[in-house]
Amino acid sequence: AYQNGNKIGYSQTSAMLTGLKKSDDFAFLKAVDSIALQQSLRDLDRGFVNFFQKRAKHPQFKSKHSHHQSYRTINQSNNIRIVGKYIKLPKLGYVKVRQSMEVGKINNVTIEHTPTGKYFAVLNIEFEPQPMNNKGGKVGIDVGIKEFYSDSNGNVVYNPKYLEKSMRKLMREQRKLSRKEKGSKNRNKQRVKVALVHEKITNQRNDFLQNESTKLIRENQTICIEDLKVKNMMRNHKLAQHIGSASWSKFFDMLTYKSVWYGNDIVKVPTMYPSSQTCSCCGFKNPLVKNLAIRKWECPECHTKHDRDTNASINILDKGLQMQSA
C-alpha cells in the first residue's frame, strides 16, 4: 500500500476490523474486549507513524506463539476497578489479584503474560505525589561499570553485576534447553527454567535501581548527571554487555520521573564536557587522563591527588550548578 501511494491509518483498519467481526471465520473476535482490539489498532498506527517519521524501527509482527503476550484496555464507565482482592476486567469479570499498593483513579490497564507463566496487571493511574522532604543537598553523579556511580561527596556505590553473577547458571540452563527436543513438554519446562533465571536478574536489577534512585532523590534537591549517549556507547562490543547490565539509561529515567513527582532538579551536563580530565581544584586539563586505564592521578599544576570517578563527579556538579544559574 505504501509503495503504491496508498495510506492505511487507524480509521481504515478500524473499518476492516468491523467487517472481520461479521465474518464466520473471525467470529472469535466478538469474544474479545472490543476496546482492547481498538487499542491494538491505535498502537499499530502509532508504530507506523513513528517509523515513517524515522523515530523508530519498522513495527514487528507479534506472533501468537510468543511466550510474552500483553494487551491494553481503557477504563470507561468504571468497567475496570479494584474490588477487595479482585480486579474487574472487561469480558473477563472478576480476577483474583495480589495487590502491591493502593491505587487511585485507573486510566487503563495492561495485562501481561510473562515467559515464566505469570500474569501481571499493570495499572496506569492518576495520583497526586506527596512532596518529599529531602535534605536539600546538591550532588554530582559519575556512572561507571565497576563502580555503578561515584558522587561528589566521595560516596561510591558498586555495581552488583547480577547478570555476571548468574551467568554460569544461565549458561547451564540454556545448554540443557538446547538438548531438549523441540515441541516436547520437557523443552517447555526447561524454557521456563531459563526464563526464571532471566526474571530473577531483571527483578534484582530493578530493585537495586529503584532503591538507589529513591535514595538520591530523598537526600538531594539538585542532582547533576552526564547526558550520556548510551545507545552510541553500546556500539563498543567489548563493553556493550557490561553497559547493558549496568542499566544507566533506566537509572537516569528513574531519576528523571521521580524528580518530576517530587520537585527535584535534574541537570544534564553535556557529554563532551571533560569531567574526568579536569582537576576539580585548579581547573587544569590533563589530556593523559583520557586513558580509561588511569584510575588515580596527580594534577601537574597543583599536585592534588585525584580518584578519577570522584573528581569527575565533582566537576559534573560544578558544571551543572553553573548551567543551572546561567
Place the predicted regions along the sequence by residue:
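N-terminal cap/recognition module
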Residues: A1-Q12
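Surface-exposed helix-capping loop/turn segments at secondary-structure junctions
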Residues: Y2-N4, F51-K57, Q221, S259-I266
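A short N-terminal beta->alpha junction/helix N-cap motif
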Residues: N4-G5, V32-I35, T304
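N-terminal, Lys/Arg- and Ser/Thr-rich interaction peptides
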Residues: S11, A15-M16, V230
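An alpha-helix initiation/capping motif
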Residues: S11, I35-Q38, R42, A195, ...
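Positively charged, helix-rich recognition surfaces that bind polyanionic ligands
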Residues: K91, E102-K105, P115-A326
